[in-house]
Amino acid sequence: MALMSKAAIVTGAAQGIGKAIAARLVKDGMRVAIVDINQEAAVAAAEELAGQYGADTMAVQCDVSQEEQVNTAVQKVLERFGTVD
């Protein structure tokens, strides 16, 4: 219950380990931003996790090697969730 309604950003979350981490967080009640360089895959993962767990998720396209994109992604998450825990 300690994670309920908290918010997280998970990078590389459209597949593999990142997606597994995001799934665990939403299963525990967290709001999760699925961040990935592949927008379509991020949207698909966010929709899948939201449907599977009834979670509040969002997809954000971001190349984490580009500082400007990271700043923009964080801003989008803060606008949606208000905070990142």
Task: For the regions a language model picked out, list residue spans one by one.
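Canonical Rossmann dinucleotide-binding motif of NAD(H)/NADP(H)-dependent dehydrogenases/reductases
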Residues: A2-A33
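A glycine-rich helix->loop->beta "capping" turn
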Residues: L3-M4, Q52-D56, K76-D85
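Intrinsically disordered, low-complexity regions enriched in polar/acidic and amide residues
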Residues: A14, G51, S65-E68
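Conserved glycine-rich Rossmann-like NAD(P)H-binding loop of the short-chain dehydrogenase/reductase
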Residues: D28-A45
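Conserved residues in the N-terminal Rossmann fold of short-chain dehydrogenase/reductase
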Residues: I34, V60-Q61
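The beta1-alpha1 cofactor-binding region of Rossmann-like NAD(H)/NADP(H)-dependent oxidoreductases
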Residues: Q39-V43, Q61-Q75
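Short, conserved SAM-binding/catalytic segment
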Residues: A45-Y53
